[in-house]
Amino acid sequence: MLYGAMTRPLLLLALAATALAPRAGAEPAPAPDPLAFVDPMIGTGPEGHTFPGATAPFGMVQLSPDTDATCRIRDCYAHAAGYSYHDPTIQGFSHTHFSGAGHSDLGDILVMPQVGDVKLDPGDPAAPGSGYRQPFSHESETASPGYYAVTLSGSGIRAELTAGTRVGIHRYSFPAGRDAHLLIDLRSSLYDYPGKILWSGLHMRPDGTLTGFRETRGWAPGRKLYFAMRFSAPLRGHAFIDRDEAIPYKGFQGPGRGSDALAEKLGKALEARMDFGPLAAPLEVRVALSGVDEAGAIANLDAEGADFDTVRTRTQAAWREALHAVEIEAPAPMRTNIYTALYHALLAPSVWSDADGRYRGPDDQVHVAKDFTFRSTFSLWDTFRAEHPLLTLIQPARTTSDIVNSLIASRRESPDGILPVWQFAGRETWTMIGYHAVPVIADAYLKGIGGFDADAALEAMVASATYAPYGGLGDYMRLGYVPIDREPEAASKTVEYAYDDWTIARMARAMGKADIAARFERRAGNWRNSFDAKSGWLRARLADGRFRTPFDPTAINYGSDYTEGNAWQYSWFVPQDQAALFALLGGDGKAIAKLDAMFDYDVSKLDYSHAEDIAGLIGQYIHGNEPSHHVAYLYVHAGAPWRTQARLRQIVESQYRPTPDGLSGNDDLGQMSAWLVFTALGFYPVTPGSNQYVIGRPFVERAVLNLPGGKRFTVETQGLSDANPYVGRVELNGAPLARTWIGDAEIRAGGTLRFVMQAMPNRDWGRARAARPYSRSTADE
């Protein structure tokens, strides 16, 4: 079945949202509240790596429970977001998390409420009471956009979380008559290892504001984070505790009641204990973050740190506005999948500048964002494909111009002078391959997004594409490919560089920079240098020109010829010129047969357990990782869109469910989710930079895109059901649409795209070459 069953809590929300549907003849009811159809628990199982906690759209703060932050880096994959649904205990509530990343860090400033004797260590999950971690039940959990709550069953404390852009607000209801305490553990960190905390500090200010910082050498070395924290109840006492036994403090004791009740403490293993005594009302803890300094955190707290209910109401309103960009009519489980996917797609790139515009850049210096908001958390190898095109389409232009301005500023401040590769907290991690900030900028420019210096952007793009020390680029510029005997993952790098080069050429041509355009148009064809005509695969070559042997198209190994994949996935990565690739494969028929072989491949005898990112397999199609994401749409390029329609159904049915285990792979900062949003609407950006969306098939009965500028673009379906999975015909604004793509400008202009569904394939629609989507070798440019 296409649509599964809803979880009970979400079903109740959905029923509540639609209970006021009008009777015949009554006035139309307002559109259902989209918050009722978002389930942040989706993807919190072992593969999705999403978090259930509270955050605002693109918020700096992601306030969420951590179920295990004690595991060491190589054992933590299921806990990349801090929370894993199948864990029985909560270790605490920390303020920073990635959504769906395949690697991790963060988990900053962990707070844990306690009663009675204060425990200073988390303890063993298998030994209740051995530390401050607490058991909990999912029946006591509530999660919705901007709000999370749970009861810690070991103590009876009710914990509630909400968040604004730069603040997180905790609300703890303690059992009556019990002494209330908070433990703040600056040692706790996701993907931890010995020595990760370089330095940290705690400072109790005269007005009762607790401030502090820590510097870590995790995924982003030298990352600094500052915080400010205020409490709604007066403190009876506090203690700053240094747990560093390896390097005990040898200096003189500062003033204070005892050795721990100090105004300030510095060290590598700090904790703070806040004591309140019995409380008659819930305790609110208001926390703001800054990447700049403690003064910045205090200013952010002053700017946004209202009471819990005010912040929750404000953030829920922001989520309603953001989610209202797409109105969905679909059966409840599908609607939940799509709205949750949209929610996940609106979490990053996250705000990194303070309320006053200051931010810490890639050079570890403080800068000021003038007339834009600096954003970070760029998982560009993943998100250039669909996440950024989705934001460009449904978010106000300011969001994308902020992103582009942040990329340009990062290049200007980078010690290497290039655009980000995988950046968070303003720091480069050098994770993954390509220079995929380039297609993000080009796609925005070509779609008419302004608000940034196009000349500076193009200069940054060219600088990134010609930086010889990076990823074999020196050899790529000299040989026309990356040689595998000099650089790992060379086949993947060659084809991805060629695509990025094509987007530079497109933008340069549109700007009238003919010399730059010609140079990168030549480079855009470099993928051909990796094509092995004898085998029909895109392969890695040696510096002397020979293809590397032995060769196994099914082999997946880190640091091999390909990046997180094999020849089956990467031999389709020529988004700028699929027609030329199909010609080399022997024509449309051969390409279709090879696509079918990919999906139908029997992988039962292959072992990919060593490759943690390889998940969501349908044959050799791997939906749980990004290189496959465009592949189902390639049948359209071969004149067989009906086969795309069948494959999309196969993927959507098997890879997305409204459950904690409902994502087949890492959400990767919104890319897995953006794929579903586009696909459910009936089209997908196979080639960002072409200004085209390839038409697939819809999974909604009706959808309305409320576009920036007040335009509305409607997707309508007739006859959509499990019995009618194929597109019979497509109409755009009432006229038959013979081509199998729709232009970005056509969507932005507003109108209606109508699908008539039927039981059997329409094998004629889209067969003609003139009807097919963009390919460089056949385009009239």
Segments (PLM) and residue ranges:
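Bacterial N-terminal signal peptides that target proteins for export
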Residues: 1-11
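Bacterial Sec-dependent signal peptides at the C-terminal "C-region" and cleavage site
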Residues: 17-30
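Accessory carbohydrate-recognition regions in carbohydrate-active enzymes
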Residues: 27-439, 445-495, 508-529, 535-538, ...
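ATP-dependent phospho-/nucleotidyl transfer catalytic cores
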Residues: 500
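Bacterial N-terminal signal peptides
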Residues: 9-19
